[in-house]
Structure formats: C-alpha cells, structure tokens
C-alpha cells in the first residue's frame, strides 16, 4: 500500500469512528431526556418534610452551651492529628 492510500484509510476510519461516537452521544442525550420525562410523569408526588419547632431546639442549645465541649475537643484533636499525618506523607 502506498502512504497516500494508507493515509486516506486512516482519515476514513477516523471519520467513521467519530461519527458513530457522535450519533451514540446524541442518542444518549435523547434517551436521558425521555427517561427523565417518564420519571416525572409516573413518579408519585413528593411529600413535604415535617417541620420542627426551631424555637424549641434553639432554646435547648442555649440552655447548656458547654454540654458538647468534650466531644468537640475530641473531634478537633482528631482532625488536627489527621491533617498533620497527611502533611507528613506528602
């Protein structure tokens, strides 16, 4: 085979491959849109979430602000330790 013929075959294969990928991606977009419309049409309506009384939870938090100090200190210590070990590994 001559180099010109081989080059033209490569261009042909490139065009064919890119064409199939483009067609597949277009098909994928339309299939995704169709599935989305089916789900919206046949899915049950969302039930609104129950709301809690925010004033009651705020009052509980204000009643004892030092209650979780030990847990907070443990979490912060673990986070600092993890960060320092990650810095040593890098």
From Swiss-Prot:
Keywords noted in UniProt: Cell membrane, Ion transport, Membrane, Sodium, Sodium transport, Translocase, Transmembrane, Transmembrane helix, Transport
Membrane topology value: Single-pass membrane protein
InterPro entries: Na_pump_deCOase, OadG
Gene Ontology BP terms: sodium ion export across plasma membrane
Catalytic activity: oxaloacetate + 2 Na(+)(in) + H(+) = pyruvate + 2 Na(+)(out) + CO2
GO cellular component entries: plasma membrane
One Pfam family matching this protein: OAD_gamma
Cofactors: Na(+)
Transmembrane segments: 10-32
Localization terms from the record: Cell membrane
Annotated EC: 7.2.4.2
Molecular function in Gene Ontology: decarboxylation-driven active transmembrane transporter activity; oxaloacetate decarboxylase activity; sodium ion transmembrane transporter activity
Signal peptide as annotated in the record: none
HAMAP family, alphabetized: OadG
Assembly description: Heterotrimer of an alpha, a beta and a gamma subunit.
NCBIfam families for this protein: oadG_fam
Chain's role: Catalyzes the decarboxylation of oxaloacetate coupled to Na(+) translocation.
Annotated family: Belongs to the OadG family.
Name of the protein this chain belongs to: Probable oxaloacetate decarboxylase gamma chain 2
